[in-house]
């Protein structure tokens, strides 16, 4: 049956207020809670529920004064039942989000066109009021890491599901392409490590010899001992065909051919290395009857942090919809659940304990493309987050821009409160502006990215979820950010 609240939503209501008189019996509160959240999710609305309190007649029934505020299936606030003093339950409902979610739901649009009875309702239009100014705080709290669940158990479940989706996608593509080998470049960083783990899991799933995973390390001008040793360790312990192809001489020959001074460490200096590595991987794939498995992640795709037709290109990109802040959790899940603990797979690698230590060291290594020479102590000089900003900020911006459709002013307001005590407001504003600048400017790379599995609600595939012109103009977004006062 269509509930009264559903009818109201079909006729334009965004927030339903239900003053109820629901008595209490054992287990009824759980059912009521589920019902409220289900109604708010199904009707894409805010739902405010309140019930009669303990001072109602108790002749046969007892009332608890249960109050619930829900938004699109998510609990915003809830009181303690059976309170004997008057209380107020309050919370922030995101009206803009409700409007955005409804704009994406075609079935709701169809139902609205069929089942509206506008003549049965009285419409009272209220001019929107500015309830909060920039100096006031939200009651509601937003997770600083929206791609990662708050509790450990859910994190483990989510990581396992992501890993299985990646594995299933790669398995199907290997079979469809009749590929004999999977070729993957290993840098000793997080993304290539996850890609190699996905390859290893896929070959176990298909019953194939892991020696048909051709793992290639290609030391260059910025490679450090730490990443080099970790790369060799994980490749060897996973049983892959380990190959080492130094790129220094080839890149120097290329510099000479195009007349580039190798002492000038500019974008040409960096991108020549990335494209040389991609060429090596592609040629090995041709030679062995396989294809190249891409390693880039969702955050890099959003920021365009890749070399066009370099690491930007592969035959199948297994990490393409996994954000950077989540990559380390998936790698950590493999380390702690496949290589140790009660669910350890004893024959997962040649030495589970050593592989696990290497994975944890990779998780602790600064994020870097290692295209610039290390310092005199052999440490990484080129750190990605110093160049483009913290990934925890960019993933926050990405999630709420794509998934919630937040405009710049609103996103800045929420981000500054969410990261209060971690980053200064001016710092958040600086990197939000950079996020918009890069996101728009780098769409041309996303317009031609390889296939890869969607693992979550936020993805940037140009073939499905994100169709954006390569020359879209960012001026309005940047202007709104620039006009925001701190």
Model-derived features with residue positions:
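ATP/NTP-dependent adenylation/nucleotidyl-transfer catalytic domains that generate, transfer
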Residues: 43-45, 54-57, 71, 78-79, ...
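CN hydrolase (nitrilase-like) catalytic-core segments centered on the catalytic cysteine
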Residues: 2-89
């Amino acid at each position: 049956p269509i509930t009264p609240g559903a009818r109201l939503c079909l006729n334009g209501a965004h927030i339903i207020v239900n003053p109820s008189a629901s008595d209490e019996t054992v287990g009824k509160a759980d059912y009521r809670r589920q019902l409220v959240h289900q109604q708010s999710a199904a009707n894409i609305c805010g739902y405010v529920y309140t019930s009669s309190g303990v001072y109602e007649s108790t002749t046969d029934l007892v009332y608890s004064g249960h109050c619930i505020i829900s938004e699109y299936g998510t609990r915003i606030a809830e009181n303690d039942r059976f309170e004997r003093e008057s209380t107020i339950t309050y919370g922030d409902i995101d009206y803009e989000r409700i409007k955005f979610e409804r704009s994406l739901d075609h079935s709701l649009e169809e139902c609205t066109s069929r089942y509206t009875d506008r003549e049965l309702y009285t419409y009272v239009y209220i001019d929107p009021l500015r309830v909060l100014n920039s100096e006031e705080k939200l009651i509601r709290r937003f997770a600083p890491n929206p791609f990662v669940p708050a509790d450990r158990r859910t994190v483990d479940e989510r990581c396992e599901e992501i890993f299985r989706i990646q594995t299933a996608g790669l398995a199907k593509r290997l079979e469809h392409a009749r590929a004999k080998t999977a070729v993957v470049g290993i840098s000793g960083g997080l993304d290539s490590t996850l890609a190699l783990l996905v390859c290893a899991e896929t070959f176990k799933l298909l019953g194939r010899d892991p020696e048909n995973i051709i793992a290639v390390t290609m030391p260059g001008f910025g490679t450090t001992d730490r990443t080099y040793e970790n790369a060799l360790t994980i490749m060897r312990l996973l049983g892959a065909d380990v190959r080492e192809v130094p790129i220094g001489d080839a890149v120097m020959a290329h510099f000479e051919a195009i007349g580039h001074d190798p002492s000038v460490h500019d974008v040409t200096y960096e991108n020549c290395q990335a494209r040389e590595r991609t060429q090596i991987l592609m040629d090995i794939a041709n030679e062995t009857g396989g294809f190249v498995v891409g390693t880039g992640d969702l955050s890099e795709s959003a920021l365009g942090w890749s070399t066009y037709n370099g690491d930007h290109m592969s035959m199948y990109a297994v990490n393409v919809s996994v954000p950077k802040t989540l990559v380390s959790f998936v790698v950590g899940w493999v380390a702690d659940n496949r290589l140790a603990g009660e669910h350890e797979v004893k024959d997962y690698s040649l030495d589970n304990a050593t592989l696990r230590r290497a994975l944890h060291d990779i998780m602790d290594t600064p994020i870097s493309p290692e295209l610039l020479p290390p310092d005199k102590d052999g440490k990484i000089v080129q750190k990605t987050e110093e160049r483009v900003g913290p990934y925890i900020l960019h993933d926050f911006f990405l999630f709420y821009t794509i998934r919630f459709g937040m405009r710049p002013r609103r996103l800045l307001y929420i981000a500054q409160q969410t990261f209060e005590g971690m980053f200064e407001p001016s710092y958040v504003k600086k990197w939000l502006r950079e996020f918009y600048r890069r996101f728009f400017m780098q769409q041309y790379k996303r317009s031609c990215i390889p296939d890869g599995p969607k693992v979550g609600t936020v993805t940037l595939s140009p073939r499905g979820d994100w169709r954006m012109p390569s020359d879209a103009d960012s001026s309005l977004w940047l202007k709104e950010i620039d006009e925001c006062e701190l």
